[in-house]
Design a protein with these regions (language model features):
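Extended N-terminal export/anchoring regions of large proteins
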Residues: 12-174, 204-214
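Short aromatic-cysteine micro-motif
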Residues: 103-113, 140-284
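C-terminal, surface-exposed recognition/capping segments
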Residues: 25-32, 47, 217, 238-254, ...
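A solvent-exposed, charged loop/short amphipathic helix patch at secondary-structure junctions
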Residues: 168-192, 302-327
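Short, low-complexity N-terminal tether/leader segments at secretion or assembly junctions of large
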Residues: 1-15
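Extracytoplasmic, non-cytosolic globular domains
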Residues: 272-301, 306
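Cytochrome P450 core scaffold surrounding the K-helix E-X-X-R motif
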Residues: 127-129, 297-303, 404
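Extracellular/surface-associated beta-sandwich interaction domains
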Residues: 199-202, 206, 293, 312, ...
Length: 425
């Protein structure tokens, strides 16, 4: 006889409401299921969708049922002025050209702006249901949904945001006005403190921020949904996650920003190539940790900024009430910093989800990505991983063991550009 599962009426009502809702897309992440594909259950409009599929031999992505999803359709590459207004579209398959075939400014260091792709505003609802995490998306405003990552520091709701197509490079690094840009042909910046990175970002634009915080959470959940999997490397490519080469010091295998063909997505399996997601090599390459000062671990407690307010002490941030325990080396003599592999992620309303203890995953199960932690300092988050971390890298890979003042060859940053209120691409 088959098993019968009985849920309480409140749970069933919530599930039925999700499934019957018009225009709501989403998934349930079953934390107790470790398989990266089996733990994701489609709900709502996409209940019967076929996930995206990557051919890692050719790098080609097939969008399947997601081909007409508004976020994917609207995601185009642009040259964008420093004030956040769009200048002109780039050829989707060759960023060195404008749409009309003439030369672009994608590597022009005199251009007052940079190369960014448009991520249109989407509303999100996220909550825990027992050990499950429910994530729902809507293109229009609804009760209980928030535009997570789409609010500026004044809490204005934006029509979208500009995702950096390239790692942050600092022009005039030795001058009084260093400026971080998103352009091809430049080496990603490294060996800078968080404050130095922040200064360079602010010098680029008053509408510029770090690529971090709630928008990374929203992007990650969209990509989990598209792939129906939490294994981001397997779903989107392995990037340059194993490209470390000590003979190439001081950058040690971190590749120069370059134009990569293949359109919106490009993913390979060699783990030594520039890959891209949403036209961004920052999201797909995993070659350098990206500083996220909007996510802190303050003496073991997560504190977050929901609107790109910058405060590396965390005094101005929301206390999530979620803590990580102190872990010890096997002999109990000292704190163990990692590497850990989370399988459970706890929702922070209006922000996203953070990894929590216990850690029962691996590079191919649970969240599939690594976690490093230090619960005795004020740690500023680093995301995605570096070219020395291999399979521990990924969209959910997280380091919360470094202070704001720590600088390294494998620490960098990228510019998120906020458009003026009411401006859309």
């Amino acid at each position: 006889m088959g098993k019968t599962y009985i849920a309480d009426k409140e749970t069933l009502d919530k599930c039925y409401a999700i499934l019957s809702a018009d225009g709501i897309y989403g998934f349930i992440e079953h934390m107790d299921v470790l398989s990266p594909t089996a733990r994701i259950e489609y709900i709502g409009q996409n209940k019967d969708f076929t996930p995206i599929s990557l051919n890692k031999d050719t790098g080609t992505m097939t969008l399947n049922s997601w081909a007409d999803f508004p976020i994917i359709v609207a995601n185009k590459p642009w040259m964008v002025r420093a004030d956040g207004t769009p200048d002109y579209r780039l050829d989707e398959n060759d960023y060195t050209k404008k749409e009309d075939g003439t030369a672009s400014d994608v590597s022009n260091t005199s251009y007052n702006g940079g190369a960014f792709s448009w991520l249109a505003k989407i509303y999100k609802q996220e909550y825990m249901l027992g050990n499950d995490r429910v994530v729902k998306f809507s293109m229009r405003e609804r009760d209980g949904f928030e535009p997570v990552g789409f609010k500026d520091p004044s809490n204005n709701v934006l029509e979208g945001v500009w995702i950096p197509m390239f790692y942050g490079s600092i022009l005039g690094a030795d001058t009084s006005t260093p400026k971080m840009v998103s352009l091809a042909g430049l080496q990603p910046c490294y060996n800078n403190t968080t404050d130095k990175e922040h200064t360079a970002i602010a010098n680029f634009s008053s509408r510029a921020a770090f690529l971090g915080g709630g928008i990374v959470q929203t992007i990650t959940d969209l990509l989990i949904m598209f792939a129906k999997s939490t294994n981001s490397q397997e779903a989107y490519g392995y990037g340059n996650s194993s490209g470390y080469d000590a003979s190439l010091a001081p950058t040690n295998g971190v590749k120069q920003n370059a134009v990569v063909g293949g359109g919106q997505f490009y993913g390979t399996k060699d783990a030594k190539s520039l890959n891209k997601i949403f036209h961004s090599i920052v999201l797909g390459t995993y070659q350098q940790w990206m500083r996220d000062p909007y996510t802190l671990l303050v003496n073991g407690r997560y504190k977050v900024s929901k609107n790109y307010t910058y405060d590396v002490t965390g005094a101005k941030y929301q206390d999530t009430g979620i803590s990580l325990p102190k872990m010890f080396e096997s002999d109990g003599s000292a704190q163990k910093y990692g590497i850990f592999y989370p399988h459970k992620y706890q929702t922070v309303p209006g922000f996203g989800a953070v990894p929590v203890h216990p850690y029962k995953g691996s590079t191919s199960t649970g969240g599939c990505d690594g976690l490093w932690q230090n619960v005795e300092i004020v740690a500023v988050a680093l995301r995605f991983g570096a070219c020395s971390n291999g399979l521990a890298d990924g969209l959910r890979s997280l380091t919360v063991y470094a202070t704001a003042g720590l600088a390294s060859w494998d620490f960098g940053a990228a510019v998120l550009l906020l458009p003026p209120v009411g401006v859309a691409a």
